[in-house]
Amino acid sequence: MTDSTIRDVMTAEPEARATPFEMATRDFLFGNVWSRPGLSRRDRRWVTLTCVAAADAPQPIEDHVYAAMKSGDIVFDEMLEFVLQFAVYCGWPKGSHVEGVARQQWARVHSERGEAAPPWPALASASLGDNDWEQRLRRGEQEFRDVNLVSAPPRDTPYNQAGILNFVFGHVWQRPGLSRRDRRIITVACVGIDDSPLPIMSHVGSALESGDLTIAEMREIILHFSAYYGFPKAEQLDRTATDAWARITSRQQKT
């Protein structure tokens, strides 16, 4: 059963395991975590890709980008949307590296099929959204409210106006290439990595309160995250999820 999970996830034959790390990878990571039914394999791909991309380990990045696309769990256009969402929350240099890997592994997948990778299409300017700045900012404010379930910040700093309202919520969160739920999963993993208390509270809480993620799914995301980025960071996510869910259920009971 475990070997079958490895084949399905990594799209490769299992290797011999000798060290404690290798044995734990087989028995715990694939035998327990990846095989759990609480999330789809695609959902787990998003958490894993976020973690390995942030960890800067070249081989795991290559392995998981390749496997995600070869398996068909994530198509190439979705991988590129992931890169953009990831870059927003974990930084442009890391995003640049993952995009380079995506290009290489996309070509590899096609090469293994005996095909030439098709040329990249030029993206239309219209895909950038509204170029009326006032309309864009208003739409960004609304998207911020829809995603975070709180009031939008004032347009009083470059970070808020140009960054949060114009770009992150005025454009990225509105792009059609991924569902809001996909972006929630990626973002929760990113803020867990980044260690910033307010974004962790905001994104974990709003993912649960919106209903985009159930508490059971959030628990599974946190377990999967802990396997790829560490139990201490996951502990903070778990505490935040517990506190957020207690507040949500308390409010529901009062209504």
Model-inferred region functions:
Residues 44-52, 82-83, 183-191, 221-222:
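Short, structured motif recognition centered on aromatic/hydrophobic residues
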Residues 53-60, 192-199:
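Short, thiol/selenol-centered motifs that function as redox-active sites or metal-ligating centers
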Residues 35, 39, 48-49, 60-85, ...:
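A cross-kingdom feature marking solvent-exposed beta-strand/loop segments within repeated
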Residues 26, 43, 61, 79, ...:
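N-terminal alpha-helical segment
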Residues 93, 164-170, 194-205, 217-236:
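Long compositionally biased, domain-poor regions of proteins
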Residues 1-42, 54-55, 63, 70, ...:
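Acidic, glycine/proline-rich low-complexity segments that act as flexible tails and inter-domain linkers
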